[in-house]
């Protein structure tokens, strides 16, 4: 009797000790934090002792091994730290004792992690594949949390690392293996690495069956068919996950099996087609109706799905599909085609006669426009002086600038030009006057000839005018080419300023050819249309037009 009592007491003592004892392990040179198996309020005092020597564990954080309340910290751990540690939770009314069995192992030279270093195995499936990092909640760590499988870093969009766990999308059997999490523990500014490994297994979700769910057709669906054409009806139903037994789909006509209905035109396919929808096993059955007739519209078509849970029925009826009015469609297409053709023709015509249309619109809508932009002139003419004189003693360029240009633009169109030599006051500083007049002009007309590359006055006016147009965006430039620069000297155009060359390439030039213009002062010529198009809207009535009124009065 005494022997049995002793045995029972021994078992109770062992089970009690085991209940309040915890196994912990780690690797050398890594951080290890152990929690006391006996829990208590945060205000309770917890004393730690090394059981073999009954020596108290210090609480000073400068020590490599120190106690911090319910936690025992090894920063870092050493193999010699292995042993049993005692923690005593002290309260005003009781004391509770717990034991922590700590084992520190040497780091493995190879990639294999022995079983005694593995944490509990977790399993996952296609819908649940979380792998938690063991004991991470005990540490003061920050992201990132690194994950490895069989010592290989995980890569790919299938692996998603969350705060303390790993999620694997579309889990497969090949995903089973040993997964290691690695993070950094921070203690008073010092960093210590921590690793933990656990196995992950993939399990197949158990199959299940459910009451049939018909995906198609919808209940009381009306399907439109064309008389004389073939029609197909599909009955599709799902029965659960995994292999399904005693599941079937079929069609009935007016409550009768297809084979018993006796209409050879209406037949269902031999066998059932298996498919999967959202992981569920489904069966499909197609009913084929050849040469649809009027009497087929009066029949009731039933899609039946049945298994061990029961029978579900969806009813379908046929209706005549309104014939397509091809004549109306052809008319609509024809009208749209004609409309698009007209638009294209109008666009082409407008593009061809855009300048004429713009000038006509100016004459009709706003023939004259007063501006308060601080400008005095509509255009400043930049041209080379001292040009080679013709046989009659007058320069062709100066004749064009001083005679033809003012006669057309000022007398016939109502513009105000500023021309060097004509609009300069006697005794006025030339440089100041040129710069002021250029800035007070809305357009800058450049007369381009081979002479411009050797003319200093032209170079200065060109620089000021281009600065206003390109840098200050205060005016626009009109380029008139009196002689093709490439005809006399291929290097002439290359000698121009880069900005002027850029304008010539971007907007082009208006070419004046005396030999090609019959009436040099006709507003209907192509040359003057392009010049007027690039000029602003006139601000006053042309001189010749305004002089007609007093002349007419005198005749009366």
UniProtKB/Swiss-Prot annotation:
Residues at the active site: 461
Covalent cross-link Glycyl lysine isopeptide (Lys-Gly) (interchain with G-Cter in ubiquitin), where: 321
Membrane side Cytoplasmic: residue ranges: 350-556
Record keywords, A-Z: Cell membrane, Disulfide bond, Glycoprotein, Hydrolase, Immunoglobulin domain, Isopeptide bond, Membrane, NAD, Receptor, Repeat, Secreted, Signal, Transmembrane, Transmembrane helix, Ubl conjugation
Residue positions the entry lists as glycosylated: 54, 95, 101, 140, 191, 232, 254, 273
Primary location recorded for the protein, binned into one broad class: membrane
Membrane topology: Single-pass type I membrane protein
Coiled coil spans: none
Region (Flexible linker) residue spans: 198-211
Entry's EC annotation: 3.2.2.6
Top class in the EC scheme: hydrolase
Domain comment (free text): The TIR domain mediates NAD(+) hydrolase (NADase) activity. Self-association of TIR domains is required for NADase activity.
Protein name: Interleukin-1 receptor-like 1
Lineage: Eukaryota, Metazoa, Chordata, Craniata, Vertebrata
Gene name of the encoded protein: IL1RL1
